[in-house]
Amino acid sequence: MSSSEDEDDKFLYGSDSELALPSSKRSRDDEADAGASSNPDIVKRQKFDSPVEETPATARDDRSDEDIYSDSSDDDSDSDLEVIISLGPDPTRLDAKLLDSYSTAATSSSKDVISVATDVSNTITKTSDERLITEGEANQGVTATTVKATESDGNVPKAMTGSIDLDKEGIFDSVGITTIDPEVLKEKPWRQPGANLSDYFNYGFNEFTWMEYLHRQEKLQQDYNPRRILMGLLSLQQQGKLNSANDTDSNLGNIIDNNNNVNNANMSNLNSNMGNSMSGTPNPPAPPMHPSFPPLPMFGSFPPFPMPGMMPPMNQQPNQNQNQNSK
């Protein structure tokens, strides 16, 4: 039993003699290497005679992959941006204390400036309000006194107007500009080179247009005579040519007079014709009748129609009144 167990142990774990062999081999190899290293000729022979150890392709590929990965990792680490957000001063820095002192001084100065500004603004507003109140009271007092003075004097205060009168004629050397002839002036600065005409003539005038304007104004003033205009109006009114109603009435009156004259002439001609017919003498031709005169009625017929604007005959008025009453 013991032998079988020993054999099993040798098979599984190995014997002591087998374990000691590699150590002996290693010691011999080490001794050989030491002897070769001590002899230089042996070392040279080993260098020239020993074949070059070739590394397998898989090992090369593994090494190249590792080198590429290490290089890419280095590049990535260089290209990455590192952002550091600090919530406070870094105590590891040497100038941390100086930075703390600067920050505290800046915050304190800003607070002082803000407080000073608010205090100044408050004082300014208070002083301005007080001044406005005092000025308002003073103005009220002045206006009250002026109103009382005007009421006592009975004079109504006039509205304030500007000091410049735009309608007033301009004056040059105590003479109106419309009465000055530019040709008479010795100095004519607007003729100098580089002069601006708008400094001497307004509303786009120049020397020549201004002279024309002055002559036209002078002519209008001469033609405008209020007394002469009033006399002309009075003469027109006396002649009846001023109103259109007077003109129509005068024209109607002239027409009526002409018609009456024509009627009288026709009646006289009719009587003469009757006398001539009875005496046997030939009748002369009757004169032409006025175009506005209606034709003469026949004997025994109705009386002639009245002309427009004339009174009807007296014998027709009672008949018309009777007809109106019957209606």
Swiss-Prot record:
Residues modified to Phosphoserine: 50
Keywords: mRNA processing, Nucleus, Phosphoprotein
Subcellular location per the Swiss-Prot or TrEMBL entry: Nucleus
Keyword Iron assigned: no
Biological processes, Gene Ontology terms: mRNA processing; termination of RNA polymerase II transcription, poly(A)-coupled
One GO CC annotation: nucleus
Pfam family, one: Fip1
Compositional bias of kind Low complexity: 312-327
Biased composition (Pro residues): 282-311
Listed Acidic residues bias regions: 64-81
GO terms assigned for molecular function: protein-macromolecule adaptor activity
Stretches the record annotates as Disordered: 1-82, 272-327
Similarity section: Belongs to the FIP1 family.
Role summary: Polymerase-regulating component of the cleavage and polyadenylation factor (CPF) complex, which plays a key role in polyadenylation-dependent pre-mRNA 3'-end formation and cooperates with cleavage factors including the CFIA complex and NAB4/CFIB. Pre-mRNA polyadenylation factor that directly interacts with poly(A) polymerase PAP1. This inhibits the extension of an oligo(A) primer by limiting access of the RNA substrate to the C-terminal RNA binding domain of PAP1. Seems to tether PAP1 to the cleavage factor I.
Quaternary structure and interacting proteins, as annotated: Component of the cleavage and polyadenylation factor (CPF) complex, which is composed of PTI1, SYC1, SSU72, GLC7, MPE1, REF2, PFS2, PTA1, YSH1/BRR5, SWD2, CFT2/YDH1, YTH1, CFT1/YHH1, FIP1 and PAP1. In the CPF complex probably interacts directly with PAP1 and YTH1. Interacts with RNA14.
Note: Present with 1310 molecules/cell in log phase SD medium.
Protein name: Pre-mRNA polyadenylation factor FIP1
Organism: Saccharomyces cerevisiae (strain ATCC 204508 / S288c)
Gene: FIP1
